[in-house]
Structures are given as structure tokens and as C-alpha cells.
């Protein structure tokens, strides 16, 4: 019926069987951003937010989210991640924080969804902790920056103009 790997011949949803795939090192890096007012950005980096250290809470939330991706996205395989990193890069000229997450493992399926989930939940955590100051924050541009390993090889998003 289709070339979609998560659909069978009758169009029913299924989890892909990865048992026959080779175990390889797989790494994915995702990015996104959250735009805010200058005051909110100053509060975050001045550690002047009532709820606490925003970036450390967002980092922890991102790591936890990467580990729980299979609980959130129905056809994702539960993975034994070996590494998750979440970093933040302030961009005061645009009143935003860039968020980057990396996930890796040695396994039979990729970690793209885990990296994307880490970025998404880190951004949501920043929003949650700062919404009393700035309800107009905008989470955007969440995308896969790169991935390596597996049958499909290497993907680099900068081919498409992403940072």
C-alpha cells in the first residue's frame, strides 16, 4: 500500500521490527529556540526567576524527556540511551535562547526523536518557569541538525540553511 515504514500492507499502524538491523553507534543533534522579552532573558541569566534556576531545570527536563520519548510518541522504540546533552546559547541581540540537545547510543534504531524531544521539553520548561513574566514567549525552529549511524548514514541540516 505505501512506503511508510510504520504502516503494514493494509495501512494499519505498526512498530517497525528492528531486530535484523546491525548495532551501530548512533548520534543525533537537534536544535530549537525560544524568543522572549529582553527582561525575561535578563531574569533567566541573572538568576532572578522566582521558580529557581531556569536553565538547570530545563536541562534536567530535557534529559528526562529524551529518556521517556517512547512513552510520548507511540511508534518509537524504547531505547537504552548512553548519553544525552542539553545546552543553551543566549542570543541577546534577538532576545532568545538557542537550545541544542544531543542523544546517542549503540543500537539498532536512531535517536533523532529523543534529541528532538529533549529540545522541545527544555523549551517548554523555560516557558513554564517564566510565563508569569512573559506569556508571549515563542518556541520555534525545532529541527534535526544532524544524525550519524545506521543504514541511512549521515544527515546534516545545514544543507537546508539551518544553523
Curated annotation (Swiss-Prot):
EC number from the UniProt entry: 4.6.1.17
Biological processes annotated in GO: Mo-molybdopterin cofactor biosynthetic process
Active-site residues annotated for this sequence: 128
Molecular functions per Gene Ontology: cyclic pyranopterin monophosphate synthase activity
Domain of life according to the entry: Bacteria
Binding annotation for substrate: 75-77, 113-114
Pathway listed: Cofactor biosynthesis; molybdopterin biosynthesis
UniProt entry keywords in alphabetical sequence: Lyase, Molybdenum cofactor biosynthesis
Keyword Acetylation in record: no
PANTHER family: CYCLIC PYRANOPTERIN MONOPHOSPHATE SYNTHASE, MOLYBDOPTERIN COFACTOR SYNTHESIS PROTEIN A
Record function comment: Catalyzes the conversion of (8S)-3',8-cyclo-7,8-dihydroguanosine 5'-triphosphate to cyclic pyranopterin monophosphate (cPMP).
Protein name: Cyclic pyranopterin monophosphate synthase
Species annotation: Desulforapulum autotrophicum (strain ATCC 43914 / DSM 3382 / VKM B-1955 / HRM2) (Desulfobacterium autotrophicum)
Organism lineage string: Bacteria, Pseudomonadati, Thermodesulfobacteriota, Desulfobacteria, Desulfobacterales
Gene name for this UniProt entry: moaC
Amino acid at each position: 500500500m505505501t512506503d511508510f515504514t510504520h504502516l503494514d500492507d493494509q495501512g494499519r499502524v505498526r512498530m517497525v521490527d528492528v531486530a535484523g538491523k546491525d548495532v551501530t553507534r548512533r548520534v543525533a543533534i537537534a536544535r530549537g529556540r525560544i524568543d522572549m522579552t529582553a527582561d525575561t532573558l535578563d531574569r533567566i541569566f541573572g538568576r532572578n526567576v522566582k521558580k529557581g534556576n531556569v536553565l538547570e531545570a530545563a536541562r534536567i527536563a530535557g534529559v528526562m524527556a529524551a529518556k521517556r520519548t517512547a512513552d510520548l510518541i507511540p511508534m518509537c522504540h524504547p531505547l537504552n540511551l548512553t548519553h544525552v546533552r542539553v545546552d543553551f546559547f543566549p542570543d541577546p541581540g534577538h532576545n532568545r535562547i538557542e537550545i541544542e540537545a544531543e542523544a546517542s547510543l549503540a543500537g539498532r534504531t536512531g535517536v533523532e526523536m529523543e534529541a528532538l524531544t529533549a529540545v522541545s521539553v527544555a523549551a517548554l520548561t523555560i516557558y513554564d518557569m517564566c510565563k508569569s513574566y512573559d506569556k508571549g514567549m515563542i518556541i520555534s525552529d525545532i529541527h534535526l541538525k544532524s544524525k550519524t549511524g545506521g543504514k541511512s548514514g549521515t544527515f546534516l541540516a545545514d544543507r537546508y540553511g539551518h544553523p
